[in-house]
């Protein structure tokens, strides 16, 4: 079995109009999938290399272990239903996880009526997802990328990387709460297992698998600031087929910030999430997914000094298709996950400015202008694991991606190939060492090996100590290499490399409380910033090593069957070189939840302190550099089929902003832009299930 698996190629071929996966010759894909998946033939050499490495590792491990292939009962089988996203990619007990992992459950998502990833991630320690205002019009901004420890994080859906470029910009703008089992957040570099752009960490949205029977739901909600949402959802299974279909229309209008200033905004968003699965046998699943979000939008920029209101409009569209094959053999401790992801993202932004305003360097005139940004992303990845014996488990894989901006002139494509290997070794009863290596070939740049080491020690069943060191190596984005309408190209820019060292503890205090504490240090070379060049700017590498240090505490307590709380604290300090840090020095979050019978209520408080350091509140574009925001929610189920819900955001009508910007005018003065977030706002709705 080992030799036959290792010598086979992880690719597809056409045979009598049916595609066959070489790893499992007895399993055939449905005919309609053949054409879509034939592209992986181009990557045959990459996967053959992976399999050659796999054969040597497996045979060597088999000989060393004396041919023992017993499956360790305490180590659960790797599959998407049970996987906890950690630095080891192994489903383990929370105490034994040699990493800092934060879990958001499906109940939390549904009870608190989260509408997007930004809302759901606010309570995660070290998370700093920032938006310009309410986010409309800035879906492509770096602020839209979830940030962990001041570095962007990779977003996965069922293990599938959703990145649309090397800066990890992703298309997970909206989520369907009914389809999510949990969201697991791994903090710290995880590039060896999850790709070179997993610098800050990994956010894995794990969806539910097949439910017995058929379930449907319709939901309507309405609020101030023009908010409306119409949603219909259907999911279930019949025989070997299972599915989930979600359709939603969401509208939003002008909003007022906490000081009463009106911000002209308009959003009309159509969302569709469709998933079909086929269970070929008790070991193999095939899944096809389509995710779409089409948005027409208008937004504004308010200039504080001049009083100018610049009104803009545009559209933002996402269309993604994902194909997955998931093989799990629990009896033999073996499995394989293979996926193909094809994403299309288009943004059209039309700017309408005051023609009398102009930047000091002449790089941008405040007049009517526009830009179109269209990216085609393709990613194919394969991951195979094998339980060798009670002590050893290996995981090996290969990945290819390419991103293409169809509107860039000249060379407009970046790509990356990589192979990776990981070994999990249990030794001396209470120790576990997980080590890995990935060889990355980022397009035209030199290839590089990056490594990871996670050592866990469990002196007691309720206590886990760990130390981890993980490296990363990520190539510049398309805009940094090829330029944009504001930036000149820089073909000489270099990839960024670095490492994160972390020490932590996971402590199950008793049956009702849990504590995670960790400290980390990240060092980075060839960080990327920008300088002026003529009438434009240019991205360049920063000299010296940038260092970021942090401390995180997360505490959970279930007081009784009704009351529970989550508390977290994050502190960071750094010597950022040549670049302004946008990570607050201190972030505090408090969750208090109460559930009894038909009622669920709760409060969430988020405090951020010293957002921009000593930068004069980023030239006065922020109302304050420190703030507390409190949200509240309530749900009531008069019957098992009906749920009435309400949510209030910014309960105390705080005037605050997560992002700032400014422009230097020709007369030398500074005009700051007001990106204040929404003031007190509410949402009420009803959901009917049948």
Question: In which residue ranges do the predicted regions lie?
Answer:
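Conserved C-terminal beta-signal and adjacent last beta-strands/turns
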Residues: 40, 46-55, 59, 71, ...
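Outer-membrane beta-barrel signature, preferentially recognizing the C-terminal barrel domain
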Residues: 73, 305-330, 373, 464, ...
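Extracytoplasmic beta-strand/coil segments of soluble accessory domains associated
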Residues: 93, 118, 122-160
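N-terminal periplasmic accessory domains that precede
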Residues: 117-120, 141-146, 171-176, 185, ...
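Short acidic/polar hinge/loop motifs at secondary-structure boundaries
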Residues: 160-187
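Periplasmic-side early beta-strands and strand-to-turn transitions of outer-membrane beta-barrels
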Residues: 204, 212-213, 221, 233-316, ...
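Surface-exposed extracellular loop regions of Gram-negative outer-membrane beta-barrel proteins
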Residues: 296, 303-304, 409-411, 443-448, ...
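Gram-negative outer-membrane beta-barrel transporters
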Residues: 426-432, 520-523, 542-616, 643, ...
């Amino acid at each position: 079995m080992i030799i036959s698996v290792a010598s086979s190629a992880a690719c597809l071929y056409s045979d009598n109009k049916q595609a066959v996966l070489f790893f499992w010759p007895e399993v055939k894909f449905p005919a309609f999938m053949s054409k879509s998946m034939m592209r992986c033939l181009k990557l045959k050499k990459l996967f053959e290399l992976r399999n050659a490495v796999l054969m040597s590792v497996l045979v060597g491990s088999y000989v060393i272990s004396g041919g023992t292939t017993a499956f360790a009962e305490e180590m659960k089988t790797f599959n998407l239903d049970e996987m906890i996203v950690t630095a080891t990619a192994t489903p383990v007990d929370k105490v034994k996880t040699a990493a800092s992992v934060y879990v958001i459950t499906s109940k939390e998502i549904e009870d608190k009526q989260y509408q997007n990833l930004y809302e759901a991630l606010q309570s995660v320690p070290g998370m700093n997802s920032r938006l310009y205002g309410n986010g409309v019009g800035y879906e492509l901004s770096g602020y839209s990328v979830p940030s962990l420890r001041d570095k962007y994080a990779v977003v996965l859906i069922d293990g599938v990387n959703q990145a649309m470029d090397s800066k990890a910009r992703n298309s997970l703008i909206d989520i369907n709460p009914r389809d999510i089992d949990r969201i697991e957040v791994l903090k710290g570099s995880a590039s060896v297992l999850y790709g070179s752009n997993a610098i800050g960490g990994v956010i894995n949205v794990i969806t539910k698998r097949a439910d017995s029977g058929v379930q449907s739901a319709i939901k309507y909600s309405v609020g101030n600031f023009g908010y409306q949402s119409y949603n219909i959802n259907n999911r279930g299974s019949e025989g070997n087929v299972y599915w989930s279909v979600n359709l939603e229309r969401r509208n939003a209008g002008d909003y007022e910030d906490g000081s009463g200033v009106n911000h002209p905004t308009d959003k009309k968003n159509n969302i569709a999430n469709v998933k079909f699965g086929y269970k070929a046998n008790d070991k193999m699943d095939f899944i096809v997914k389509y995710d779409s979000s089409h948005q027409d939008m208008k937004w504004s920029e308010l200039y504080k000094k001049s009083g100018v209101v610049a009104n803009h409009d545009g559209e933002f569209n996402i269309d993604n298709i994902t194909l997955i094959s998931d093989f799990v053999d629990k009896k033999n401790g073996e499995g394989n996950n293979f996926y193909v992801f094809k994403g299309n993202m288009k943004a059209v932004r039309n700017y309408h400015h005051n023609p009398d305003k102009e930047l000091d360097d002449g790089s941008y005139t405040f007049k009517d202008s526009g830009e179109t940004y269209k990216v085609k992303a393709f990613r194919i990845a394969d991951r195979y694991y094998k339980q060798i014996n009670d002590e050893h488990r290996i995981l090996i894989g290969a990945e290819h991606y390419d991103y293409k901006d169809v509107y860039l002139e000249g060379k407009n494509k970046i790509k990356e190939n990589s192979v990776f290997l990981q070994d999990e070794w249990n030794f001396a009863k209470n120790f576990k060492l997980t080590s890995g290596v990935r060889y990355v070939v980022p397009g035209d740049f030199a290839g590089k090996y990056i490594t990871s080491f996670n050592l866990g020690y469990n002196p007691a069943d309720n206590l886990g100590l760990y130390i981890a060191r993980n490296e990363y190596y990520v190539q510049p984005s398309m805009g940094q290499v090829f330029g944009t309408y504001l930036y000149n190209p820089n073909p000489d820019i270099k990839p960024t490399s670095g490492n994160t060292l972390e020490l932590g503890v996971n402590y199950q205090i008793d049956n009702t409380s849990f504590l995670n504490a960790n400290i980390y240090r990240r060092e980075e070379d060839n960080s990327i910033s920008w300088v002026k060049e003529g009438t434009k700017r240019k991205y360049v590498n920063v000299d010296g090593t940038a260092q970021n240090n942090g401390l995180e505490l997360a505490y959970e307590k279930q007081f009784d069957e009704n009351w529970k709380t989550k508390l977290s604290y994050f502190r960071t300090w750094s010597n950022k070189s040549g670049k302004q840090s946008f990570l607050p020095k201190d972030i505090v979050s408090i969750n208090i939840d109460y559930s009894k019978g038909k009622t669920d209520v709760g409060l969430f408080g988020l405090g951020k302190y010293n957002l921009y350091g000593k930068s004069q509140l980023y030239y006065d574009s922020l109302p304050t550099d420190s703030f507390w925001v409190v949200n509240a929610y309530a749900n009531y189920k008069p019957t098992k089929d009906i749920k009435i819900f309400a949510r209030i955001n910014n309960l105390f009508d705080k005037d605050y902003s997560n992002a700032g910007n400014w422009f230097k005018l020709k007369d030398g003065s500074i005009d700051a832009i007001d990106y204040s977030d929404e003031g007190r706002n509410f949402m009420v709705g009803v959901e009917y299930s049948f």
